[in-house]
Amino acid sequence: MAEQASSFTDRLAARFAGAQISVVQPRGEVTLEVAAAQWHATCLALRDELGFEQLSDLCGVDYLGYGSDEWDTADVSSQGFSRGVEGKALGRFAWGEFPSQESSNGAQPQQLPTQRFAVVAQLISYQHNQRLRVRCYAPDEQVPVVASLTDIWPGVNWFEREAFDLFGIVFDGHPDLRRILTDYGFVGHPFRKDFPLIGNVEVRYDDERKRVVYEPVTSVEPRVGVPRVIRDDARYETAAGEVGKSETAK
């Protein structure tokens, strides 16, 4: 039987003093947030002491622009989302430009978060029938570095390579940290929020050179098709209300 989230978080708090622990209700998801300096030691203790023998997934996260929306209109607009096409929000800019994060109405650039890049690992304990999410933030956003977990869970090898390829997160101690998804000579890291949505280069076949060539993007104009909108998901509120009703009925 799965351990209740409350008792499980108590054990985590007792073992990892000073770590930030959160529980998402009503799903009962537990997240353990640790400092980058304690990332490797914490994961080792989770495997050896708390029985998390499998790492099912690891990914990078870029929190640049997190929590900000591009369309905060409360009422229906007859003009649609025309404002976003003029602005240079995250990812919506052309070759050679840098995202100013300035909206079309002249708003000041948004302050970048102090902790931009994070690494998130999903762990499973079969003996305790428990799942855990572990997260740490890279201290330096210019060169994000965290310790590799390949000596704890060897299967994380390609997950870390993927996070390096897509986000540029360096995993210290990785035995073979190189790109895994992008092409040879690829410039940048495509899952970063400041990476242009239209890309940096385009590919075409050159008849004179008789080969494929890479050139700066010139045939695609950046535009907004879908605005970034923050909404409250009523599904979770409904689920929480149903749980409350069932507890009251008991």
Curated annotation (Swiss-Prot):
UniProt KW Cell inner membrane keyword: yes
For this UniProt record, the keywords arranged alphabetically read as follows: Cell inner membrane, Cell membrane, Membrane, NAD, Quinone, Translocase, Transport, Ubiquinone
SUPFAM superfamilies for this protein: Nqo5-like
Gene3D superfamilies xrefs = NADH:ubiquinone oxidoreductase, 30kDa subunit
The UniProt catalytic activity note for this protein reads: a quinone + NADH + 5 H(+)(in) = a quinol + NAD(+) + 4 H(+)(out)
Task: Give its localization.
Answer: Cell inner membrane
Write down a Pfam family by its short name.
Complex1_30kDa
- EC number(s): the record gives 7.1.1.-
Which EC main class describes this enzyme? translocase
Q: Does the entry feature the keyword DNA repair, yes or no?
A: no
Question: What GO terms fall under cellular component here?
Answer: plasma membrane
Molecular function (Gene Ontology), one example: NADH dehydrogenase (ubiquinone) activity
PROSITE patterns attached to this UniProt entry:
COMPLEX1_30K
Q: How does it sit in the membrane?
A: Peripheral membrane protein
Main location per the UniProt record: membrane
Family designation: Belongs to the complex I 30 kDa subunit family.
* Subunit structure comment from the entry: NDH-1 is composed of 14 different subunits. Subunits NuoB, C, D, E, F, and G constitute the peripheral sector of the complex.
Query: What is this protein's function per UniProt?
Result: NDH-1 shuttles electrons from NADH, via FMN and iron-sulfur (Fe-S) centers, to quinones in the respiratory chain. The immediate electron acceptor for the enzyme in this species is believed to be ubiquinone. Couples the redox reaction to proton translocation (for every two electrons transferred, four hydrogen ions are translocated across the cytoplasmic membrane), and thus conserves the redox energy in a proton gradient.
Q: Which HAMAP family match?
A: NDH1_NuoC
Q: What is this protein called?
A: NADH-quinone oxidoreductase subunit C
Q: Which organism is it from?
A: Xanthomonas campestris pv. campestris (strain ATCC 33913 / DSM 3586 / NCPPB 528 / LMG 568 / P 25)
